[in-house]
A protein has these predicted regions:
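Glycine-enriched, solvent-exposed interface loops adjoining structured elements
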Residues: 1-197
């Protein structure tokens, strides 16, 4: 069930299940609304960056996909833009140099670049100080556990989720049948011997 739930969530997000992406219709937004969370931090951490303008922040461990992110800067160098919200634009490691040097795509008074550096850490690139980093994201769904598990056995244990107690699907009930159908199909596929195709 857990694998089916994860598959359905990812398919709804990227549009493979319905042909529309997660925020395109009210129906799709409702299916995943229980997984949408907001996180903000003012705690910059140490890190070795790709540029002299790098700032590092931790992000939550339950992130599946970031759907929106912004920063707030009160840097005096911003002039009248001081205290304004700046959008954050993700870039790949390969794109960073040419994007950073492009005056229309690089970081500026309205835009900050983001690199994913692993270990639930992001590198934000801005020549201005960053006072607050905020994200809205789709979180990983908690595993579906149909019965309490025997001692010592856990599924998806985290600091906030014990992983050994009965836990039903927390998603919108309208999507439960789809998750069940995917789970049945996965179970059937796992029992059918491979024909070598």
């Amino acid at each position: 069930m857990t694998k089916a739930q994860e598959s359905v969530v990812i398919s709804l997000y990227n549009g493979n299940l319905t042909g529309d992406s997660f925020e395109k219709t009210e129906e799709l937004r409702r299916y995943l609304s229980d997984l949408v969370k907001t996180y903000s931090t003012t705690d910059e951490i140490d890190g070795e960056g790709r540029t002299e303008d790098s700032h590092f922040f931790h992000i939550p461990e339950d992130i599946l996909f970031i759907t929106y992110e912004s920063v707030l800067s009160n840097d005096d160098k911003l002039g009248c833009a001081k205290g304004s919200i700046m959008e954050v634009v993700p870039v790949t490691q390969d794109e960073l140099h040419k994007t950073k040097e492009n005056p229309f795509r690089g970081s500026n008074k309205r835009r900050v670049l983001r690199l994913d550096v692993g270990d639930y850490t992001v590198e934000l690139i801005s020549s201005f100080s960053i006072d607050k980093y905020q994200i809205r994201y789709l979180s990983k769904p908690e595993p579906i556990i149909l019965i309490d598990l025997p001692d010592g056995l856990t599924i998806g244990k985290t600091d906030t989720f014990p992983g050994d107690k009965e836990n039903m699907c927390k998603l919108n009930p309208a999507i439960h049948r789809t998750i069940l159908e995917v789970a049945v199909n996965l179970a059937i596929k796992s029992r059918v011997p491979s024909t070598g195709k």
